Amino acid sequence: MESKVIVIHHGSHSLKIGLASESVPKTIPNYIARKKKEKISTPTITTTETPTIVSPVESTIINNKSNENNDDIMKIDVENTVTPSEAVGTTTEDVKSTLPMATTITTDEQVKPTSSTSSTSTTEEVEIKPTESMDIDKPITDSKTNITSNIKIEQPPPPINIQTQTKIHIPKKLLEEVEQSVKETTKLLPPVDYIKVRQKPTLYNENNSTTFEIIKKKKKKTSSLSSLTNVSTTPPPYVPQPLNYNEIDYCIGDDAIAVSRDKDKWFAYQPITMSTFNTGIYHSVQSMFDDITQMWKYAIQRYLNIPSSDLSSYGCVYVVTDNIDRKSLKQITTLLLKELQFTSVLFFQESICSSFGVSMATQSCVIDLGHQKISIACVDEGYLLPNTRLTLGYGGEQLTKLLEYLLTGMDKSDSDTLTRQMVAKQIHKYYFPFKSSIYELVDFSPFYLNVFDNIKIENLDYYYNDFQKQRVGTFKVKDIKHDKHMNIYHFNADEVYQVVGMSLFYPNILSQFGGSSVNYLIKSRSLANTSESNLYVEDQKHYYNHYLSSYDHEDPFDDHSHILSFAQNNTSRDNKDGSNNNNIINNNIINNIINNNNNNNNNSSSSSNNNNNNNNSGSNSNINSYNNNNNNNNNNNNNNNNNNNNSFNNVTIVTSTLNSNSTVPSTLNSNSTVPSISNSNSTVPSTSTSTTSSPTKKLKIESSSNCEDNYIDIPLDIAILKSVSQLERSDINKKKYLSNILLVGGGALAPGIQDVLRVCIFKQLEQQYQAQQLQFQQQLQQQQQQQQQLQQQLQNSTNSATTTPTPSSTTIMPLENYIGFANSSIRSDVDCRHAGWRGGAILGCLESTREIWITRSEWQDGKNSSALNKLPF
């Protein structure tokens, strides 16, 4: 069955697809390109003589004949078109033969020319509206699918360099903090383990930075006699034929990136962003599903050489994200089993597949450094712990945009131009040759992002302590004016790579270039603020009814039993007490829908008193203040269960290890004040999607196309500690996960990232250790004072000998460097970028997974409820 299984891993950067028997998948960039509609000019004829009247019957006959031959191919205005039936000795049938095939001929019902006329040609825009879908099994020469009419970006917006970069504003202080963090991190890095070669690099300027070469045609290989005699039994790997972009109007992957440079004829877009459906660019959801299905069919046929008619004999392993939405999973299952006609489908999560892909079955913390997001989760022997799932709304694409922004020059649209130019010179001191010109505009389009992404991959590293290394970058770009010329650019760069690499721990900088929005997170989570009680009193029933109306009875993956029981409890309480109906709904609907907690049965007076005690200690800007509040929260753990709503907006998290003043709001609850490892009693609720659908997702003031409520923007080092701290296990087990960190994805290939990440995590642990030492000293002083007061009271009252309590002699063990990475034990033939796909291929071939395959017959015969029991998560 190995050769009959196709593994699909559709991530934010690329579509990885291939047979399970293959060792490496076909990597296809996640782009679709379509050719824009062409404006066709049609000839119209104007008359100069007096017309004669024609009967309406003749005009109707001519119109019916023309409409029968042309069904909805092109649209032409009927009232503004005049067709000469007898002009210059020609008939209507002759005129029809001379006009384009797709033109519909119409006539005026009251006018008919009788004599010679002078013809002039005028242009008229015609809209082509295809009706049939593309047959993917045939050679892809034209696209007949009317997907472009359902996409909002038919006409791309103005260039981003003009429209978007004017809004990008990176504060000078924030860039200085990043540079200072680079310097302090450099002091803690281990020495470089290779020989430093000191060379004087060439300084490039406007005169010597650009050269060109002539592109030579590839010669066809001729078969020799020796090759004919030595015939191998294994067939050569299938290589798709190159496409002629002038003959097609649909392509994906690298072809879509190549044609996206010609913005006048093509436009490129992504159907999936951040590993979720990109519904923001489509007018209808069905058109988006058709687009994704067509992309999968095209990829299977072109890159795997498997026609879509043969997919009925193949099974599919689909690798989903860790926090997959249940309704999205239902749609993916329908597309794979009904549209693509696979026999069966098997789902596994990314973190589990990544651990199997690198042959690691022990306890590990899997970190996927992706293109548009970073996923963090703890895996224990093939089981993903749901409380530890975290997703950061930034990734390698934001680093690429930041690099392009710094290399091409800072934005000069601000009034303080001199200050911005000085900041640009401090970061990038050298000349960069590839910039916008009158011939082309360098922006954030797919083609130019791919150019700067290659620059980032070749030059970005985290060896900050190698001061003698001078980076000289070289890249090639095809000349836009001469097709046979390839321009070669050379440039110098040093500090700019350090700032870009260290910005991975500063989400405030990366949020300027897309990804998850912090402001949106504040708006979507502001429902938890009880100060807006008037909003809930008026609209709380509307929100609850809206959630019930969005309930999908056909969804086998969603369990709404807790909502139904909640509704029954509210109805019984309303019947008992009708006077306090509004208060009951306010206290229960908010606590159950926002926090998804059924244990809020205490009085409202006790919760308000606890809120007043914790409002002053809820907002802090560094790790030390979090640890100071942790002791108070643990002492009053029973009273703090009802304070989630009032103290929600007071929680903040530091943006970096060295930035104690600037804070980033996050989506943490009030109980999750300390992402601490050493405190086993402090539990942090997970912000990721649980196995049951949470009502919080359905109750939003503003809708989001990309489900941004699943993403948080906190630094990477703090997110790792937060994920491990959410383990409901002892401190010893938590240390095992920290000592076995697995980095996968494209970002894991950056040289030196393990050492920098180890230093940043160690800083956070050291701050927590210092805070714990301070707490221990304060507790010890309080115990000594209480002992002295007790002794004085005993001496004043009686002189009898009594035993006095002694302070506890427990001490905090010193912090040890127990942070380790599992990447050093991975085999050299394993690519971290394909770890998820490789794990899916391994799991799809196991005999033990046959029982959890979802078959097509089970999905079509109304047995959808059985699919819930077959999910491995």
Curated annotation (Swiss-Prot):
Location, primary (coarse class): nucleus
GO biological process, any: double-strand break repair
Entry keyword Ribonucleoprotein: no
UniProt biased composition (Polar residues): 651-668
InterPro entries referenced in this protein's UniProt entry, alphabetically: Actin, ATPase_NBD
Pfam families documented for this protein: Actin (PF00022)
One GO cellular component term: cytoskeleton
Xref: Gene3D superfamilies: 3.30.420.40
Region of interest called Disordered, as start-end residue ranges on this chain: 108-129, 596-701
Ranges of Low complexity composition bias in the record: 114-123, 596-650, 669-696
SMART domains on file: ACTIN
Tagged with keyword Transmembrane helix: no
A GO MF label: ATP binding
Chain positions recorded as ATP binding sites: 368-371
Homology family: Belongs to the actin family. ARP8 subfamily.
Self-association state and partner proteins as the record states: Component of the chromatin remodeling INO80 complex. Exists as monomers and dimers, but the dimer is most probably the biologically relevant form required for stable interactions with histones that exploits the twofold symmetry of the nucleosome core.
Protein name: Actin-related protein 8
UniProt source species: Dictyostelium discoideum (Social amoeba)
Taxonomic path: Eukaryota, Amoebozoa, Evosea, Eumycetozoa, Dictyostelia
Encoding gene per record: arpG
